[in-house]
């Protein structure tokens, strides 16, 4: 915990999803939630077959799912989502990539998380 899963479409310019991006996201998670950085785990999934709306121009997306142990306040989860969204938007903008960018923050049940 925390777990970050970054899904993105194959039209994302190469090199955007990197250890540097994950490190930036990890630091945001630590700053906002107080989690131990050594427990942050990130992975990415590229989607080659996708459709956004009815678009035929191949517009893509980035979606970050963040799972943290339950117990954080609504305000903490809102701040976390907003800051991560800002970092992802900045990254996409810097790469010149126009895509839908979303973040979802989910709780992990302490009763059902085993380590």
Q: Positions of the model-derived regions?
A:
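A domain-level signal for the structural core that forms small-molecule/cofactor-binding pockets
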Residues: 1-115
């Amino acid at each position: 915990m925390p777990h970050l899963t970054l899904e993105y479409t194959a039209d994302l310019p190469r090199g955007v999803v990197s250890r540097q991006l994950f490190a930036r996201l990890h630091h945001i998670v630590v700053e906002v939630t107080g989690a131990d950085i050594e427990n942050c785990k990130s992975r990415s999934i590229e989607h080659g077959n996708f459709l956004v709306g009815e678009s035929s121009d191949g517009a893509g997306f980035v979606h970050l799912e963040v799972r943290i142990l339950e117990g954080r306040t609504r305000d903490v989860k809102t701040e976390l989502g907003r800051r991560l969204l800002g970092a992802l938007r900045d990254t996409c903008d810097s790469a010149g990539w126009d895509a839908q960018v979303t973040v979802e923050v989910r709780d992990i049940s302490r009763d059902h998380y085993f380590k």
